[in-house]
Design a protein with these regions (language model features):
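Mobile "lid/hinge" segments at catalytic clefts and subdomain interfaces of large enzymes
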Residues: 2-57
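Gly/Ser/Thr-rich beta-alpha loop segments that engage phosphate groups in nucleotides
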Residues: 8-9, 62-63, 196, 222
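Basic, gly/Ser/Thr/Pro-rich low-complexity segments located predominantly at protein N termini
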Residues: 11-12, 65-66, 199
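Catalytic core of soluble alpha/beta enzymes
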Residues: 70-226
Length: 226
């Protein structure tokens, strides 16, 4: 559930595109949904109390201006706690960094600093040490394969590392990602590759490689079953 927006999805100074909560310590979908809604409203209250309540992003999350991206993680963790849930045990955090948006082809402009992919990976490692993060989508630019490989080699055992912009549901890009172990999961978007046949090929290859396979919604999708 997307509760705090930045990047291209919001008119704010936050670089990370999506901060999400993942309710997983529940027996039913209805209980998990209730937890997500309560945390969303808890975050709204916290933002208001700190004078940070502003607009809403494209994905429905709040879009405050923050001093640093890590402040978003703090706010989400506190919202989980204030709502009465245990961070990491009942509800965890997922990120869609969409790092391509602040990648210049060599370095990353995040928190007002221009840093290398290696140092960005270290920043993520620090976040993993401090916050109950279970998934990070697009932590690096779509052609920064070395940073993907380095980070997945170091942290893939403790967090889901999802390629979306990295793979664009393309079987050839996925083959490269599998060969160098660039990630351990892929986001599937049918309209990126354009045919059911190619989409199913990507799903098959990702599962054979042991990747987590996530079927994405699309912002402009209809109510049709297919």
């Amino acid at each position: 559930m997307n509760i705090l927006n930045g990047g291209a999805h919001a008119e704010s100074n936050v670089d990370v595109q999506e901060f999400m909560v993942v309710p997983h310590g529940f027996q039913s979908f209805s209980e998990a949904l209730r937890a997500g809604v309560e945390i969303y409203h808890s975050l709204k209250t916290n933002l208001k109390q700190e004078g940070l309540l502003g607009g809403v992003g494209d994905e429905g999350g709040f879009a405050p201006n923050l001093s640093r991206n890590e402040e978003g993680l703090r706010l989400v963790r506190e919202a989980i706690e204030v709502a009465g849930y245990a961070p990491g045990k009942e509800v965890s955090i997922a990120l869609d960094v969409a790092a391509q948006e602040f990648f210049d082809g060599s370095n990353y402009l995040i928190d007002g600093e221009l840093i290398s992919g290696t140092n960005l990976g270290r920043k993520y490692s620090d976040w993993l040490d401090e916050y109950p993060i279970v998934s990070i989508e697009d932590p690096f630019g779509e052609d920064d394969w070395d940073s993907w490989k380095e980070f997945t080699s170091r942290e893939g055992h403790r967090v889901q590392i999802v390629g979306d912009d990295l793979y664009v549901t393309n079987p050839k890009r996925l083959e490269k990602g599998i060969s160098i172990q660039a990630s351990n999961a892929i986001l599937i978007k049918l309209n990126q590759i354009g045919t059911f046949t190619e989409t199913m090929e990507v799903i098959r290859k990702s599962k054979e490689a042991g990747f987590g396979t996530i079927i994405s919604h699309r912002s402009g999708e209809t109510s049709d079953d297919i």
